[in-house]
């Protein structure tokens, strides 16, 4: 096979092939820290006997710091900024492996995970045998019950009426090779900038099989993915990524931020490269054929079918795993190797799905990395968005230097719905303030205004209950230290919308407090979701 990373000289066919029959069970061991040493060839480039795509599962030591997540519960938010040793086995951990979908893995899948952890070059055969009727049933119940139907028009409730018989038939078709993937139903959803984003809705049976296959493949790739990678992974949600970025900038000597955006990432994933990357770990030809069926099933829009030669539908169950695998080889491993080989100063990396932020101490490193990154993406059919990719001066030392020069404060950048601002604590120390992005807030208010208009025919109690749940959901994500003013802005806007709603129902002239119950005011002020520190006054809506 062709050289995938430019530094690797080992093809998938040279790796060991492992057969897994699910005959044993192992405990939940974490990934060891040790990584493979890099050697230098005559040209001065890093070379490794093992491909750097098989680097041992060491978390990114400059990115993922030890800080309790705002929403993470009792678990630690991320690994330490410095070198760290993971607990090899924790007695409090359950024997069964937790997955992104919360589906319990079988004993055989525990063996797959154990083998993937111990041997980074192993290629797995007979993986499709782990797609059992039990796993398909669990995958069916893990799907959203109110999700929109695909091209087949099948809903979850209709399939559930005779799901046992249908699951058995689906299982037989998968293992006979007669299963056929259906095209995705394309719909369009609005983006914050006013443009439309294509969304692919898979047929129900395709969702079930994709969910089951994702559970199987997660056992392998969760042992390969690096600590800098977040998004659509067990225990690595948005708040953990935000905390990792916060601690990385706060504790490291960061003076420059590269806020990068990949143009149309899901629509431009190269199928050939993706399959080559998958073959580094998968030797099961039946499973590879199944993955090809989903990639090349095409899309259906307004009753017209069109082939898909590139990209994966955004919204498909398997697409997040595809994206993480693709960027693991194209971006993550390459960035870590570039940092060790070419960087002069410290570099931090945090990636959430296709959205990533890089922090640099030296400006020369930032400019060199940006140029090398453009070349790297071109090789694999990707492109950085020229208008949304920015290199800005940001961080503790950036703020100090700009203050000495008499310049304006450092620019801000948005990441995962929050605007990051260089600020100071009450004691005068440097800190990073994070507030809800104003575009997100305005978009949410507009969305609720339109939805309230559609619910004019409903009774007030039903609408009030819905509005209260929407506000609670917003607070559960956006209630972080320093974001109190943004939450209050949304609360005030929703109260105004609710007041107008009551007036349209014949309550003209009455005060909101004396009219129908206020669903926003019914939320207690001492709600845990609103226990956040005060921030500087935010922008008005």
Q: What function would you assign to each model-found segment?
A:
Residues 1-541:
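Non-catalytic terminal/accessory segments
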């Amino acid at each position: 096979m062709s050289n995938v990373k430019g530094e690797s000289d080992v093809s998938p066919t040279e790796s060991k092939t492992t057969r897994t029959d699910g005959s044993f069970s192992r405990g939940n061991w974490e990934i060891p820290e040790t990584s493979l040493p890099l050697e230098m060839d005559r040209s001065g480039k890093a070379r490794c006997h093992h491909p750097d795509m098989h680097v041992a599962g060491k978390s990114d030591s400059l990115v993922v710091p030890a800080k309790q997540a705002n929403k993470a519960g009792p678990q630690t938010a991320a690994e330490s900024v410095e070198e760290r040793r993971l607990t090899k086995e924790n007695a409090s951990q359950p024997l069964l492996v937790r997955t992104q979908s919360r589906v319990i893995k079988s004993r055989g899948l525990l063996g797959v995970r154990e083998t993937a952890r111990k041997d980074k070059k192993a290629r797995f055969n007979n993986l499709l045998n782990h797609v059992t009727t039990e796993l398909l049933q669990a995958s069916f119940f893990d799907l959203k019950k109110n999700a929109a139907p695909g091209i087949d028009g099948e809903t979850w409730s209709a399939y559930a009426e005779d799901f046992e018989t249908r699951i058995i038939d689906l299982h037989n078709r998968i293992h006979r090779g007669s299963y056929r993937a259906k095209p995705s139903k394309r719909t369009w959803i609005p983006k914050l900038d006013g443009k439309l984003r294509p969304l692919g809705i898979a047929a129900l049976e395709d969702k079930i099989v994709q969910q089951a296959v994702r559970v199987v493949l997660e056992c392998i790739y969760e042992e390969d993915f690096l600590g800098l990678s977040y998004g659509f992974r067990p225990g690595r949600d948005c708040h953990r990524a935000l905390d990792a970025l916060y601690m990385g900038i706060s504790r490291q000597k960061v003076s420059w931020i590269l806020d990068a955006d990949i143009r149309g990432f899901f629509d431009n994933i190269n199928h050939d490269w993706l399959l080559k990357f998958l073959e580094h770990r998968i030797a099961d030809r039946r499973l590879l054929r199944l993955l090809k069926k989903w990639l090349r099933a095409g899309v259906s829009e307004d009753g017209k079918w069109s082939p898909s030669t590139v990209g994966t539908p955004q919204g498909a169950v398997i697409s997040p795993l595809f994206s993480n695998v693709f960027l693991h080889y194209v971006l993550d491993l390459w960035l870590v190797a570039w940092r060790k080989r070419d960087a002069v100063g410290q570099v931090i990396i945090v990636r959430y799905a296709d959205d990533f932020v890089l922090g640099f101490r030296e400006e020369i490193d930032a400019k060199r990395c940006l140029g090398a990154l453009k070349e790297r993406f071109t090789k694999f059919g990707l492109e950085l968005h020229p208008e949304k990719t920015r290199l800005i001066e940001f961080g503790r030392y950036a703020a100090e230097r700009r203050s000495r020069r008499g310049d304006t404060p450092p620019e801000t950048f948005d990441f995962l719905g929050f605007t990051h601002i260089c600020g100071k604590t009450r004691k005068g120390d440097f800190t990073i303030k994070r507030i809800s992005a104003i575009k997100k807030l305005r978009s949410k208010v507009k969305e609720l205004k339109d939805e309230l208009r559609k619910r004019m025919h409903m009774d007030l109690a039903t609408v009030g209950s819905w509005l209260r749940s929407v506000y609670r959901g917003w607070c559960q994500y956006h209630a972080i230290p320093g974001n109190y003013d943004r939450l209050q802005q949304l609360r005030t806007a929703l109260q105004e919308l609710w007041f107008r709603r009551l007036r349209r129902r014949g309550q003209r002239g009455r005060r909101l407090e004396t009219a129908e119950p206020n669903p926003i005011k019914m939320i207690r002020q001492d709600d845990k979701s609103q226990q956040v520190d005060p921030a500087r006054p935010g922008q008005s809506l």
